[in-house]
Amino acid sequence: MGAKSKQYFNIFVFVISLIFFDQLSKYLVVKYVKLGSIYFSFFDNFFRIIHVRNTGILFSMGSDIHYSLKKIFFIAMPIFILIFVFSLALKEKNCITRISLLLIFSGGVGNIIDRLFRPSGVVDFLDFKFYGIFGLDRWPTFNFADSYVVIGMILFLVYDFFIKRKVLNT
């Protein structure tokens, strides 16, 4: 196997593993946790597994818009954006940037799978107490795909704003 083939294989395994873990976790929540109920909580209700559905996007924004507009804004546009992100990841030479882009891609694909095959919405289940920060008693419930996107974005921004600029300035 050539170096380029091995690189593509590693990318494939990384992405498929993340998407599989996201979809498996959602499958288990759907199978074992009744919609709207709390499966269990830890540390005096700090962390809970709860089964909710999100028909909107980030923090349920847009859940009220018409179904045909949702198809455009929540499925079609993200698919084009994800294709672009994936193509950037394949071309990227820097490992940190590539991983951050692949995390964003994998999370986006995980949630698009839900939008395509779960008409009642994206499965969210990770729920944390937020102690009134930003006026929130609890952080909006999310899933692993959401985490991949957020971690990928943070990694990308930290690298781009702090590490890469520091290297370029020396």
Curated annotation (Swiss-Prot):
It is found in: Cell inner membrane. One of its GO terms (molecular function) is aspartic-type endopeptidase activity. Keywords: Aspartyl protease, Cell inner membrane, Cell membrane, Hydrolase, Membrane, Protease, Transmembrane, Transmembrane helix. It comes from the Bacteria. One of its GO terms (biological process) is proteolysis. The chain crosses the membrane at residues 9-29, 72-92, 95-117, 143-163. One of its GO terms (cellular component) is plasma membrane. It catalyses: Release of signal peptides from bacterial membrane prolipoproteins. Hydrolyzes -Xaa-Yaa-Zaa-|-(S,diacylglyceryl)Cys-, in which Xaa is hydrophobic (preferably Leu), and Yaa (Ala or Ser) and Zaa (Gly or Ala) have small, neutral side chains. The active site is at D124, D146. It is an enzyme of class 3 (hydrolase). Belongs to the peptidase A8 family. PANTHER family: LIPOPROTEIN SIGNAL PEPTIDASE. This is Lipoprotein signal peptidase. It comes from Borrelia garinii subsp. bavariensis (strain ATCC BAA-2496 / DSM 23469 / PBi) (Borreliella bavariensis).
